[in-house]
Amino acid sequence: MKELLSKFENKRPELVFEWKDPYTDAEGWVVINSLRGGAAGGGTRMRVGLDKREVESLAKTMEVKFTVAGPAIGGAKSGINFDPKDPRKKEVLKRWFAAVSPMLKSYYGTGGDLNVDEIHEVIPITEENGVWHPQEGVFNGHFKPNDSQKINRIGQLQRGVSKILDNANYSPDLSKNYVVADMITGYGVAASIAHYYQIWGGELAGKRVLVQGWGNVGSAAAYYLAQKGAKIVGIIDRVGGLIQTEGFSFEQIRELFIQKNGNELNAPELLNYETVNAEFWNTPADIFIPCAGSRMITEAQLTQLIASGVSVISSGANVPFADSEIFFGPIAEKADASLALIPDFIANCGMARVFAYLMSSDLEQLDDAAIFEDASQTIFTALEKTYQNNQQSRGIAKTAFEIALKQLV
């Protein structure tokens, strides 16, 4: 696995596009790791301090993710080094998409990512540049549909990703108009844990869960885990957190989901960050879901989690451990050798899978249950393949990487 991994990590990307904004200090990169299957896909992010290496490592991460989620295409990523809070953000994005739109028409598909919104920024700005849909390049390069299929499937994509949930099994509150894109990644993280117990043995109901991050992914994963009978015992995010060793009720978690303030936990009894950070990592628990930023979990925190009884980690965040390696550094390796580590490219592939599902065939209707169950089944299949190669609860991530990399190297 190590050999395959270093081969994949060190292989030069097929295409790197570099951009410098003439009017601000913004700069950006598109990295297309490969045009496997004729196209590549990966979102567009913006943050201060982003560099080409970050974009390249995320493009490689996407390529691995597509081996699970489909379609069988290359990985890509776009990144802009600029402050997303700057009032000139929209102008910067307009000039950026004007520059990259020829790729988006031909062989590259993008979407929203960190600090870049799919619905309010990516779709309208790419449309202004003559791109039918941000995924048009994947249609043209990979699926090669005829015109009527293309129109139909672009319609499916547009409606599917922003479909308002009307099934109470998937929506915390039908009156709030939550959409597929709000919930699907967190749903996949929860499903990956349920499937882990289903395949390797054990029972999710009653298990104690620690959640890091209360954005779309963490809050939705916690909601669906609580719905399945798990007990959320601790939540930490950048503003503070909550700890309840006997576990919050499903109703309390539902309320915390509904009351969140954008991507932040919002509760009257919120503990400050210092207090919660001192307690969180030592709270007795069975499951930990890192759903905050990348490369945050230190070795000391991992050691505390293991000592607290954590035996399953499902990676809601991409590359959650504070390793410098693109995929699998010493901290990730220690986690994988000590407990059941479900890797990011399986656990958080929900959104990528929805894209593949909506693009690959002409559907009779768009149905919440069909979309969510398809994502769940995709995650189940990936874990089942892993189990066929390794029945131990240790080394799951290593085995899963091996299966993915054999398709790519």
Ranges and model annotations:
Residues 23-36, 67-72:
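N-terminal glycine-rich anion-binding loops that anchor highly charged ligand groups
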Residues 32-64:
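N-terminal cap/recognition module
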Residues 167-284:
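Glycine-rich phosphate/diphosphate-binding loop of Rossmann-like nucleotide-binding domains
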Residues 240-341:
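Rossmann-like adenosine-cofactor binding region
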